[in-house]
Regions:
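Cation-handling catalytic/transport regions enriched in His/Asp/Glu
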Residues: 1-180
Length: 180
């Protein structure tokens, strides 16, 4: 293999750290005088810490987040562009989530789960019955999520069909739109 970049990780919470998970870069990939400048990428999370003599045991949601952010890291590490301004996640908003969504989707595939979701003491893979329950739970509260997407779409349509935005009061406009 060859050097493609450096990945730093900071996965556990601490008092001075903001919540959530994200990827960023100290240096983006680019070309300078026909020489590849390799990226320096970092992934940050706030995953469950190890306790006592037990390792960090991630929840399913934390595993999805880890895969998601690693997708962003791969996007940054595997860039091969001339200009830093086009490197990694410095792409159009509609594309920036593609690598991370692919990784997140893979994380929920049963055959992939069997590779990483193992009992920390026995090494036994996650049982098929538990995978089925996890998959079934993904449909829970789907009606609410659909209503949220529709509300955002209707609000967008109202904004984009305005003839003028002069003197518009944003909060009033959005309240009226969402109360239709």
């Amino acid at each position: 293999g060859s050097h493609i970049g450096i990945l730093y990780t900071d996965y556990f919470p601490r008092e001075s750290k903001r919540g959530g998970a994200w990827m960023n870069s100290y240096r983006k990939q680019s070309m300078k005088n026909d020489e590849m400048i390799t990226p320096v990428i970092f992934n940050v999370g706030n995953f469950s810490k190890p306790t006592g003599d037990k390792p960090s045991l991630l929840s399913y949601d934390e595993a999805l987040t880890l895969f998601h952010e690693f997708g962003h890291a791969l996007h940054g590490l595997l860039s091969n562009v001339k200009y830093e301004s086009l490197s990694g996640t410095a792409v159009s908003r509609d594309f920036v989530e593609l690598p991370s969504q692919i990784m997140e989707n893979w994380a929920s595939h049963p055959e992939v789960m069997k590779q990483y979701a193992k009992h920390y003491e026995t090494g036994e893979s996650i049982p098929d019955e538990l995978i089925e329950k996890i998959k079934a739970s993904e449909n829970f509260n789907q009606g609410f999520a659909t209503v949220e997407f529709l509300a955002a779409a209707f609000l967008d349509m109202d904004w984009h069909t305005l003839n003028s935005v002069d003197n518009i009061k944003v909060n009033e406009f959005e309240t009226t739109s969402l109360n239709k």
